[in-house]
Amino acid sequence: MGRFISVSFGLLVVFLSLSGIGADQECLPGWSFYEGHCYKVFSEYKNWVDAEQYCTEQENGGHLVSFHNREEVDFVVKLGYTILKADIVWIGLRDFWRECHWEWSNGAQLDYKGWSDEPNCFIAYTVGNKWLRRKCSSTQQFICKARVPH
């Protein structure tokens, strides 16, 4: 009986591993999984354009992080603070044409807002969960978001 339970448990572990239930196993090493996407915090300081380019070079479909609900913001804020112990990171939101037409660097529609009125790129505080506009030429640490690799 003990051998049957042991074998059954072993098969369950193998099945769960292969089916992708093991969270971070769906992302490349160093990336964190949440709701179908992979996230990675970078401690390098870059301006917004260079940070976005760096994200696109990291993984297929990668961009500076975009948010689509409060739960995703909470996950990313916690991830950023845990790794960096810093309070500000670039996010993918920018007024590309300087006409107050805000969109994410990955082309997604802005469907969740969290900022005060102020330049043309956005930072997020990893403490207090606030977004602020900042000059795109200033340098910050950043977080990339990418699709899960297939």
Curated annotation (Swiss-Prot):
It is found in: Secreted. The keyword Hydrolase does not apply. Expressed by the venom gland. Its main location: secreted. Keywords: Disulfide bond, Hemostasis impairing toxin, Secreted, Signal, Toxin. GO terms for cellular component: extracellular region. One of its GO terms (molecular function) is toxin activity. SUPFAM superfamilies: C-type lectin-like. Coiled coil: none annotated. Gene3D superfamilies: Mannose-Binding Protein A, subunit A. Disulfide bonds join C27-C38, C55-C144, C121-C136. Belongs to the snaclec family. This is Snaclec CTL-Eoc125. It comes from Echis ocellatus.
